[in-house]
């Protein structure tokens, strides 16, 4: 048993420094041998002249709020969930936030049937205008009858005479054959 202890070695506590005062706890990046290391130089520049690392130092002030958190209200608290019933079950659904103005990525893919299909910027006079603070209900979306101009996966142009079932069938087939992740 003693032989095992001798082979393992002994662990001992560090002795306090002579003089009885608190130990000199200088951070590693303030030591003389770390002057040339880039991380030490970066840390030294952030510390500046304040090298007081004792726990008795005053606490730091809280960080300021992020600018976008102050100006925007919480979207989840402003939009009430929609409730719908299918058969005997009732479901609640929280609608997506309204699209940001200036994000015209979906404008190129959708058009109203009244718009001219050959124009580069389709006319939306038959579609209801969306208020940026209001999400359209499901009934409004069905009544607006937006039509997909082309497939977002293969970019095939859809004939205006195609039914919604034909478009959905093509999208399902294209999505099934796709190996890429698509964000809708």
Swiss-Prot record:
Component of the Fanconi anemia (FA) complex required to recruit the FA complex to DNA interstrand cross-links (ICLs) and promote ICLs repair. Following DNA damage recognizes and binds 'Lys-63'-linked ubiquitin generated by RNF8 at ICLs and recruits other components of the FA complex. Promotes translesion synthesis via interaction with REV1. It is found in: Nucleus; Chromosome. This is Fanconi anemia core complex-associated protein 20. The modification Phosphoserine is found at residue 119. GO terms for biological process: DNA damage response; interstrand cross-link repair; translesion synthesis. It comes from Rattus norvegicus. It holds the Pfam family UBZ_FAAP20. Residues 47-57 have a biased composition (Polar residues). Component of the Fanconi anemia (FA) complex. Interacts with FANCA; interaction is direct. Interacts with REV1. Residues 1-30, 46-81 are annotated as: Disordered. The UBZ2-type zinc finger binds both 'Lys-48'- and 'Lys-63'-linked polyubiquitin with preference for 'Lys-63'-linked polyubiquitin.
């Amino acid at each position: 048993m003693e032989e095992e202890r001798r082979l393992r070695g002994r662990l001992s506590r560090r002795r306090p420094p002579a003089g009885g005062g608190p130990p000199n706890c200088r951070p590693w990046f303030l030591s003389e041998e770390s002057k040339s290391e880039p991380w030490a130089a970066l840390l030294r520049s952030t510390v500046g002249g304040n090298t007081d690392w004792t726990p008795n130092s005053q606490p730091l002030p809280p960080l300021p709020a992020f600018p976008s958190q102050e100006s925007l209200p919480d979207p989840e608290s402003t939009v009430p969930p929609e409730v719908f019933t299918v058969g005997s079950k009732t479901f609640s659904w929280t609608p997506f936030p309204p699209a940001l103005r200036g994000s015209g990525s979906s404008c190129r893919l959708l058009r109203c049937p009244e718009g001219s299909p050959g124009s580069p910027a389709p006319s939306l006079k038959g579609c209801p205008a969306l208020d940026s603070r209001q999400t359209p209900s499901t009934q409004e979306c069905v009544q607006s009858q937006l039509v997909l101009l082309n497939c977002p996966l293969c970019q095939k142009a859809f004939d205006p005479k195609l039914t919604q079932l034909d478009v959905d069938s093509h999208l399902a087939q294209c999505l099934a054959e796709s190996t890429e992740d698509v964000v809708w």
